[in-house]
Amino acid sequence: MPTINQLVRKPRKSKVEKSKSPALNVGYNSRKKVQTNVSSPQKRGVATRVGTMTPKKPNSALRKFARVRLSNLIEVTAYIPGIGHNLQEHSVVLLRGGRVKDLPGVRYHIVRGALDTAGVNDRKQGRSKYGTKRPKG
């Protein structure tokens, strides 16, 4: 326990909160080829690999993911939500934050219905989260 005198000389440091989606907090100046300190809610990127991975221990499935090179030249792993997708290598995708609890290292979600990513077909409820248009009739 420090004395009052020690605290007067060197006060306590406040904790710095770490971002849960750090790649969204980095911009890129392509003219100077330097990373900048600009945050954004979403980022555009190009899928470099599309595949499936298995979740952590109590769960069992084949979760769809894409490895994405962002516009700030950072490469991250992102989850593809919904049933079925049309993504391939070189597809342009929009990324948002949000981790997947049972996939280690996956801290981002791909936004369905934006850029090259199609919305989920035949979805009636929760359509806005999956980029699905309102059904006719």
UniProtKB/Swiss-Prot annotation:
Please give the residue ranges the record annotates as the region Disordered: 1-57
Tell me one GO biological process term.
Answer: translation
Q: Which UniProt keywords apply?
A: Methylation, Ribonucleoprotein, Ribosomal protein, RNA-binding, rRNA-binding, tRNA-binding
**Positions bearing 3-methylthioaspartic acid:** D102
Give GO terms: molecular function aspect only.
rRNA binding; structural constituent of ribosome; tRNA binding
CDD domains, per this entry?
A: Ribosomal_S12
Q: Which domain of life is it from?
A: Bacteria
Q: Which InterPro entries match?
A: NA-bd_OB-fold, Ribosomal_uS12, Ribosomal_uS12_bac
CC annotations in GO: small ribosomal subunit
Quaternary structure? Part of the 30S ribosomal subunit. Contacts proteins S8 and S17. May interact with IF1 in the 30S initiation complex.
The record's NCBIfam families line, in alphabetical order, gives: rpsL_bact
- Family statement drawn from the similarity comment of this UniProt entry: Belongs to the universal ribosomal protein uS12 family.
Q: What does this protein do?
A: With S4 and S5 plays an important role in translational accuracy. Interacts with and stabilizes bases of the 16S rRNA that are involved in tRNA selection in the A site and with the mRNA backbone. Located at the interface of the 30S and 50S subunits, it traverses the body of the 30S subunit contacting proteins on the other side and probably holding the rRNA structure together. The combined cluster of proteins S8, S12 and S17 appears to hold together the shoulder and platform of the 30S subunit.
| Name of the molecule in the record | Small ribosomal subunit protein uS12
Naturally occurring in which organism (per UniProt): Streptococcus suis (strain 98HAH33)
